[in-house]
Amino acid sequence: MRRLKRDPLERAFLRGYQYGVHGKSRELCPFTLPSVRQAWINGWREGRGDNWDGMTGTAGIHRLNELHAVG
């Protein structure tokens, strides 16, 4: 059975979240299409907020599961 492709906006959000939670710059956004770029930046903001709240490493595992960022 073929696996369905994920929504590109969801994938962009999750990639942005990963960048944000690791403290990387917003300027590293790889997307130029406005809707996808906005989804990435929204994910980055969420990740950055979690980074500031101390949800990194093992403390942030439950948050990654909420966002389905872990398979």
From Swiss-Prot:
It is found in: Cytoplasm. The keyword Cell wall biogenesis/degradation does not apply. This is Ribosome modulation factor. Belongs to the ribosome modulation factor family. GO terms for cellular component: cytoplasm. The keyword Cytoplasm applies. During stationary phase, converts 70S ribosomes to an inactive dimeric form (100S ribosomes). It comes from Pseudomonas savastanoi pv. phaseolicola (strain 1448A / Race 6). It comes from the Bacteria. One of its GO terms (biological process) is regulation of translation. Keywords: Cytoplasm, Translation regulation. The gene is rmf. It holds the Pfam family RMF.
